[in-house]
């Protein structure tokens, strides 16, 4: 499966401001988002399932891949394109056994060692970060910056996206590293005009 990682949106209901998630995701896709990850940490399994199912209706319509954060059971239940796992989540090899070879598995990494391990274990792509300070992740151990991103990117051969504090003022510097895409939350979801916010993060608009 050929995946376009150029503009990777991660959901977060805290930024909805009363708006419908389906509408927000649709506007983001119309603005240029190429892949969507459903990431909702503080909800019940049933609620997460309902949220993911709702988002998948939109991503299916626009033929955009949908990734589920951490929850393999939800990914299987809605037949998502794949999952994204952190360093403390289920091991990649076990996730691959459960999901099979045709599903996408992404791994969060913050240094070269983690990146090479994930690549060697068969990750389809990496989420590299945290690049810049951000308010949406509370357990950030280290900000790696553009230099750290470049070192990791240069050490691997699989696709990767950068994450952490990326916005319309700095995304071009991030893309200069040769990374396949940028992953954002508030840079799109915290804006009033979702479609425009997404479009402002495209290098070739």
Curated annotation (Swiss-Prot):
Binding site for 4-amino-2-methyl-5-(diphosphooxymethyl)pyrimidine: 37-41, 69, 108, 137
Pfam family, one: TMP-TENI
Species lineage: Bacteria, Bacillati, Bacillota, Clostridia, Eubacteriales
Swiss-Prot/TrEMBL cofactor(s): Mg(2+)
Alphabetical list of Gene3D superfamilies matching this protein: Aldolase class I
First-tier enzyme category under EC: transferase
Any one Gene Ontology cellular component term annotated for this protein: cytoplasm
Residues passing through the membrane, by range: none
Protein name stated in the entry: Thiamine-phosphate synthase
Residues noted as binding 2-[(2R,5Z)-2-carboxy-4-methylthiazol-5(2H)-ylidene]ethyl phosphate in the record, renumbered to the chain: 134-136, 165, 185-186
InterPro entries: Aldolase_TIM, ThiamineP_synth_sf, ThiamineP_synth_TenI, TMP_synthase
GO molecular function: magnesium ion binding; thiamine-phosphate diphosphorylase activity
Keyword flag Transferase: yes
């Amino acid at each position: 499966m050929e995946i376009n990682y150029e503009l990777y949106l991660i959901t977060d209901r805290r930024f909805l401001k009363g708006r419908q998630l389906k509408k927000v995701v649709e506007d983001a896709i119309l603005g240029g988002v190429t892949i969507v990850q459903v990431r909702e940490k503080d909800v019940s399994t049933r609620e997460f399932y309902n949220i993911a199912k709702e988002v998948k209706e939109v991503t299916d319509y626009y033929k955009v891949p949908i990734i589920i954060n951490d929850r393999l059971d939800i990914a299987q239940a809605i037949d998502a394109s794949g999952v994204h796992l952190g360093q403390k989540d289920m091991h990649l090899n076990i996730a691959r056994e459960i999901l099979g070879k045709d599903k996408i598995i992404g791994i969060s990494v913050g240094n070269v060692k983690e990146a090479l391990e994930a690549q060697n274990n068969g990750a389809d792509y990496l989420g590299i970060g945290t690049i810049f300070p951000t308010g949406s992740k509370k357990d950030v151990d280290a900000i790696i910056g553009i230099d750290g991103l470049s070192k990791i990117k240069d050490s691997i051969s699989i696709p990767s996206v950068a994450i952490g504090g990326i916005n319309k003022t700095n995304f071009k510097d991030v893309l200069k590293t040769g990374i396949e895409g940028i992953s954002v939350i508030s840079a799109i979801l915290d804006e009033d005009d979702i479609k425009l916010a997404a479009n402002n993060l495209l290098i070739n608009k």
